[in-house]
Amino acid sequence: MKTAVYPGSFDPITKGHLNIIKRASKVCDKLIVAVLVNPEKKGLFSVDERVEMIKRVTKNHSNIEVQCFSGLLIDFMKEKKSKVIIKGLRTMSDFEYEFKMALMNNKLDPNIETVFMMTNAKYSYLSSSSVKQVAMFGGCIKDLVPDEIIPDIKKKINHKKECI
């Protein structure tokens, strides 16, 4: 059984992330969405909240698991007996960064492969940071994040606008 891992902070999960998750789940037997615990970074949502939101939006996909991890991704991969990392790419700058990370991961464990998936063009501009910015300034995020998590974002940002 081939298990792949799609790591990220997902703060919050976007429609771009969800697009990669759904597509990646079709090319492996099991996909683990691995939510990074970064104690040096204060996110909008806690790790537990992010895990719960991703579970909510992927609940109809039986081969998707959502877990958190801290430390080296390679250690998490070994623990989960996975040899495949899934990474989504939006732009050339994403590729440059992710290529370096893939080389480092391969240096740490030559058995690990990184598979790059191109983001759907309609999400190529989208990032969790831009979602937070748009929401904080009262913009509409309906086309940016899954509908199921809009109430979570509204509550965190304490926003009253209807089309957030």
Swiss-Prot record:
Entry's localization field: Cytoplasm
InterPro entries: Cyt_trans-like (IPR004821), PPAT (IPR001980), Rossmann-like_a/b/a_fold (IPR014729)
EC class of the enzyme, as a word: transferase
EC identifiers of the protein: 2.7.7.3
Gene3D superfamilies the record matches: HUPs
Names of the cofactor(s): Mg(2+)
GO molecular function, one term: ATP binding
Key words of the record: ATP-binding, Coenzyme A biosynthesis, Cytoplasm, Magnesium, Nucleotide-binding, Nucleotidyltransferase, Transferase
A Pfam family hit: CTP_transf_like
GO terms classed as biological process: coenzyme A biosynthetic process
Segments forming a coiled coil: none
UniProt key word Iron: no
Chain sites annotated for binding ATP: S9, F10, H17, G88, L89, R90, E98, Y123, S124, Y125, L126, S127, S128, S129
Annotated binding of substrate, by residue: S9, K41, L73, K87
Protein's pathway: Cofactor biosynthesis; coenzyme A biosynthesis; CoA from (R)-pantothenate: step 4/5
CDD domains documented for this protein: PPAT
Site for Transition state stabilizer, residues: H17
Catalytic activity: (R)-4'-phosphopantetheine + ATP + H(+) = 3'-dephospho-CoA + diphosphate
Example of a GO cellular component annotation carried by this entry: cytoplasm
NCBIfam families: coaD_prev_kdtB (TIGR01510), cyt_tran_rel (TIGR00125)
Purpose of the protein: Reversibly transfers an adenylyl group from ATP to 4'-phosphopantetheine, yielding dephospho-CoA (dPCoA) and pyrophosphate.
Family statement: Belongs to the bacterial CoaD family.
Self-association state and partner proteins as the record states: Homohexamer.
Protein name: Phosphopantetheine adenylyltransferase
Species: Clostridium botulinum (strain Langeland / NCTC 10281 / Type F)
